[in-house]
């Protein structure tokens, strides 16, 4: 595991080497070394989308999240995990949340949970409209570039991935799918 915190990348570091310590530059890693990935795998059940959510974290995003969990203590950690699997409006039902891998020595942190997303389904005139986008993104707030006095800095360089898949039931057909954003 070769994680290097972003805040020291590109800095000089002294490496012990007996009587002659070495000064070297800490290498900068690519932005994709830090990943925040949330995926949903749904199927239609009654009037709701039901399925599994899978959250993966690597690099600075993993370190940030693990610090957040550690600061919260054991009492609130399950609630934090469930909130991170939920949509921004927290209107989905999240159950059976559990860690798959939270070992700090491993590259990825991973937790999963069961999801019931009833607000994603709207039915009218025998047709079903499905909203797959949970709008779950930590850093998607609008940046006002007209009123700012300083440069805008994101907290860390990272790739944020949000993916949702839906298994279409037998006998159903897709009538319209909006273009990709």
Report residues per predicted region:
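A sensor for short, sequence-defined functional sites
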Residues: 1-181
């Amino acid at each position: 595991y070769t994680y290097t915190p972003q805040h020291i990348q590109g800095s000089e570091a002294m490496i012990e080497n007996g009587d002659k310590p070495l000064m070297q530059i800490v290498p900068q890693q690519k932005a994709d070394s830090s990943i925040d990935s949330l995926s949903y795998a749904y199927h239609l059940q009654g009037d709701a989308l039901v399925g599994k959510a899978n959250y993966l974290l690597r690099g600075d995003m993993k370190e940030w999240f693990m610090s957040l969990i550690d600061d919260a203590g054991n009492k609130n950690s399950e609630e934090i995990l469930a909130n991170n699997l939920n949509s921004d409006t927290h209107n989905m039902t999240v159950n059976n949340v559990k860690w798959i891998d939270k070992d700090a020595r491993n590259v990825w942190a991973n937790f999963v949970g069961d999801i019931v997303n009833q607000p994603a389904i709207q039915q009218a005139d025998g047709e079903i409209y499905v909203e797959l986008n949970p709008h779950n993104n930590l850093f998607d707030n609008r940046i006002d570039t007209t009123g700012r006095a300083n440069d805008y800095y994101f907290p860390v360089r990272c790739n944020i991935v949000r993916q949702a898949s839906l298994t279409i039931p037998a006998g159903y057909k897709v009538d319209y799918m909006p273009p990709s954003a």
